[in-house]
Structure formats: C-alpha cells, structure tokens
C-alpha cells in the first residue's frame, strides 16, 4: 500500500510508521501546522493536490481531523485515523459520518458513544507500542527493576 501520513506533534508516529514500513508499505509524510482542525483552505488545497498528484491507497493520521476527512471524501481516498486522546473534540463533527473514514479509538466508551450515534466506520483499538524499541531503551531484563518505581518501598508511600 502507498500511505500518505499527516504528521503533527503526536508521540506515536515513529512506531506506527516503522510498523507500516516493516509490513512492506510505502509511506509519504506531510507536515503542516494547523490553525483549525475543521477548516483550513490552504492545507486542504495542499493535501488535495498531493492526493491527486500521487496514487495513495489511504491517508493516515494519529487523531481525527475533519478537514482531512473532507478532502478524502472528495477525492475518494480512504481515511484512517487512530485516536490517542480523549475527549477528542475534533471527532464531534459531521464529517465522522463520511464513508471514507475508518476511525479507530483507544477508548471503548468513546467507541460506544460514536457507534450509538450511528457512526458506522468506527472500531475499538487499544494503543500499541514498538516493544523491540522499548526493550532496547529499557535494557536487559535484569536491569528492568531500575525502571519500576513501585518496587521501591520509599516510592510506595506516595
């Protein structure tokens, strides 16, 4: 698959992009500061030109962006978002009903709420982590105790 990934200041893009690449997908990134998640004619133009200029199988974002959903709906490209924040105010937008959307949320109550409102393309998906990267950061298993504050009797009193 050829994936266009909109990157902003979310912490988990590196792990997600690495996983896409390991699965054999191609990833192009686009970054731009947004003043509004709902309306940004300049950014909509930029992303629409990018989509129309290159074949993408999907657009992916961490968290949901109504303006990206609107562009994907217009261009007929699938929009996949995976939320890592709650409440995610940007989801309370009429665009969540677009057929292009595939919304994944880590919060089961959020999933149930939007499913109850009639959003068809929403699923519950817990957050994930690149365990190999975390293992490398934490060191050998015998050193893992260094990172567990709860094991320290002094820390338990807090």
Predicted regions and their residues:
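Extended catalytic core of nucleotide-activated donor transferases of GT-like folds
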Residues: 9-19, 23, 28-114
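Catalytic core of nucleotide-activated saccharide and alditol-phosphate transferases
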Residues: 80-158
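Extreme N-terminal starter segment of soluble prokaryotic enzymes
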Residues: 1-3
């Amino acid at each position: 698959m050829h994936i266009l990934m909109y990157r902003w200041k979310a912490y988990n893009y590196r792990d997600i992009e690495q996983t896409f690449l390991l699965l054999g997908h191609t990833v192009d990134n686009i970054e731009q500061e947004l003043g509004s998640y709902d309306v940004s004619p300049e950014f909509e133009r930029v992303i629409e030109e990018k989509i129309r200029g290159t074949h993408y199988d999907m657009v992916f974002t961490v968290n949901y962006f109504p303006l990206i959903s609107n562009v994907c709906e217009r261009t007929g490209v699938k929009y996949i978002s995976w939320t890592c924040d709650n409440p995610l105010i940007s989801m309370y937008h009429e665009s969540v009903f677009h057929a292009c959307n595939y919304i994944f949320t880590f919060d089961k109550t959020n999933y149930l709420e939007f499913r109850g409102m009639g959003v068809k393309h929403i699923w519950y998906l817990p957050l994930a982590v690149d365990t190999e990267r975390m293992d490398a950061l934490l060191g050998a298993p015998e050193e893992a105790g260094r990172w567990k504050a709860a094991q320290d009797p002094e820390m338990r009193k807090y």
